[in-house]
Curated annotation (Swiss-Prot):
This is NADH-quinone oxidoreductase subunit H. InterPro entries: NADH_UbQ_OxRdtase_su1/FPO, NADH_UbQ_OxRdtase_su1_CS. Its main location: membrane. Keywords: Cell membrane, Membrane, NAD, Quinone, Translocase, Transmembrane, Transmembrane helix, Ubiquinone.
């Protein structure tokens, strides 16, 4: 029963967050482009997400004549479900208890598993199947080309992201996300500074992994009309849409855990520790989401060859170099996990 309550406690706010992330994005881009953004439905346009949801609910779901109906319907469901189940291992805070004179950190999470990092990477990589199936089952050249682009893009950047995550694991000595945050909090400050450049690479890779601007080539309007979801309408289209924005929030949460200290305040000041850890965690995610939106409004789209070159010829060598550099520095200074940290 407690597990069910915890799931609802996370899923309901997450779904509302996804809905209002769309509103937040439209408002921010409107302000950057000197427009009002949503302002008609409800005060300040706050009811716009509900109006959009009702519109999509009452529209007729159209299935192309030559489409594979079962796979066509399952693809958006797969994408959306995978975007949600990853949150089972994401910690939102921690409770510190003292046992036998030692402080033990207990993360506030649905499933406190010791391989949380591997779980996140595994489930995230499965998201590509929903996109590939959507493009193939639509029997549309535009949709299929968009899905192929998305597959190549996500696979290319997952290599760099995996190496960057390996760097974080080497630094902390654990695959448990809650323990990772607690370990990083107790590390010397210079290690965090050394990790910041690779954190920037990780965030840019997130933009490509989530098919966000300036790497939204799978749905480049000028070339592919709308990409892999061009044949979708009504709620199947909405599920793709919700899955994309849920992955944005998930990526921001992972960036927060790996590089921004999780639920701990940015500075080790006693006054800042009076603010609940959940608030710090949410504030950091909101800041990263703002950068997601800001990037969309200000940076032009990359060409496909530029995207591939950036992933394989720039980010991959940097990631490999940083794994070697971090390992060597930690070993030389005696800060490897289990060697005096």
């Amino acid at each position: 029963m407690n597990t069910l309550v915890n799931i609802l406690f996370i899923m309901i706010p997450l779904l509302f967050s996804v809905a209002y992330l769309v509103y937040f994005e439209r408002k921010v881009i409107g302000a950057i482009q000197l427009r009002h953004g949503p302002s008609v439905v409800g005060p300040f346009g706050l009811l716009q997400p509900f109006a959009d949801a009702i519109k999509l609910l009452v529209k007729e779901p159209i299935i192309p004549f030559r489409a594979n109906t079962i796979l066509f319907i399952m693809a958006p469901m797969l994408t959306f479900i995978l975007a949600l189940i990853v949150w089972a291992v994401i910690p939102f805070g921690a409770e510190v208890i003292t046992e036998n004179g030692q402080q033990i950190v207990i993360p506030k999470v649905i499933a406190n598993v010791n391989i949380g990092v591997l779980y996140v990477l595994a489930i995230s990589s499965l998201g590509i199947y929903g996109i590939i199936v959507a493009g193939w089952s639509s029997n549309s050249n535009y949709a299929f080309l968009g899905s192929i682009r998305s597959a190549a893009q996500m696979i290319s950047y997952e290599v760099s992201m995996g190496l960057i995550v390996a760097t974080v694991v080497i630094t902390t000595g654990t695959l448990n996300l809650g323990e990772m945050v607690a370990t990083k909090h107790s590390m010397p400050f210079w290690i965090d500074l050394l990790m910041m450049p690779i954190g920037v690479v990780f965030f840019i890779s997130l933009l490509a992994e989530t098919n966000r601007h300036p790497f939204d080539l799978p749905e480049a309007e000028a070339e592919l009309v709308s990409g892999y979801n061009v044949e979708y309408s009504s709620m199947p289209f909405a599920l793709f849409f919700l899955g994309e924005y849920a992955n944005m929030i998930l990526g921001s949460a992972m960036m927060t855990i790996f590089f921004l200290g999780g639920w701990y305040p940015p500075l080790k000041l006693s006054l800042l520790y009076k603010i609940p850890g959940l608030i710090w965690f949410v504030l950091k995610i909101v800041l990263l989401l703002f950068i997601f939106v800001w990037t969309r409004a200000t940076i032009p789209r990359y060409r496909y060859d530029q995207l591939m070159r950036l992933g394989w010829k720039v980010f991959l060598p940097i990631s490999v170099l940083w794994v070697i550099l971090i390992s060597g520095v930690l070993l030389f200074t005696g800060n490897l996990p289990g060697r005096g940290l």
